[in-house]
Amino acid sequence: MVRIEERPEVNTLLAGCRDLALQVEQTLNMYDEESELSVMCRDYRPGQPYEVTALLYDFLDTSLSMAKRSNGAFDPTVGAVVKRWGIGSGEVRIPAEKELTDFINRTGYHHIRLLPDKRAAIIDIEGITIDPGAVGKGLAIDYIIHYLKDYHVEQACLDFGGNLYVMGDTYRIGVRGPEDPEKMMAIVSVKDQAVSTSSWYEHYMERDGRVYGHLIDPASGKPVESEFTSVTVICDRAVYADMLSTALYVLGAEKGEAVLRSLREESGICVDYLAERAVDGKIVSYSNTLK
């Protein structure tokens, strides 16, 4: 929702929002063989600079920075593992251990180096596949919010598949629990902030009576066995909320909060989160918002 009453450029404004979202989708969709990201992963030569557009460079820079800060708990290079498990297809395809080891050997954010002066990436091994799943929605929201502010829009609420951003007004956002989608496990008030949730129950697959979540642990190459059933992150940048909800789900409370403290101390990025513990259903929360 964008409030733009009595403004003659309304259609142009909304078309601009759609164009930005489409541009991100066409650039980053790893399931589209013609997206720029897919073409790069298919055509790059190990050790050779590969020039990219400004949007793809921004994505790579943002996601690799978070991968480094989280010590790989968030890692965009798990795309091949994600595809092998069938995540996104609706059908679980469990890899053998040896096969999984082979896939893990083709992951690792440290295999990618960026060249800002050339707007290029150097990937030093073959077979890297980059997954934008925990970045793309947040990045698109941030681009659109920046665009709306350039047009002096004062109030907006964006919803990209559960990734939210509220601008101007204060909204009360309900966070759904795992047992009953109609029951809220928490209500959060946000203004000029993004909200992103990672959980096993929003997107999962079943096979032989076992449930598999859609989030992959980069260390094991298997679906995450988290101490949380869900993690909801609140941050003034949607892309950080998107990435950090995934990182915290993988890391757990102690290691995750250390990452949040370093973000505030080194970059001034403030993050709140709340999570439901898997062991007892207790809601835990953390805030490092500057007052």
Identify the role of each PLM range.
Residues 1-291:
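Mature catalytic core of soluble alpha/beta enzymes
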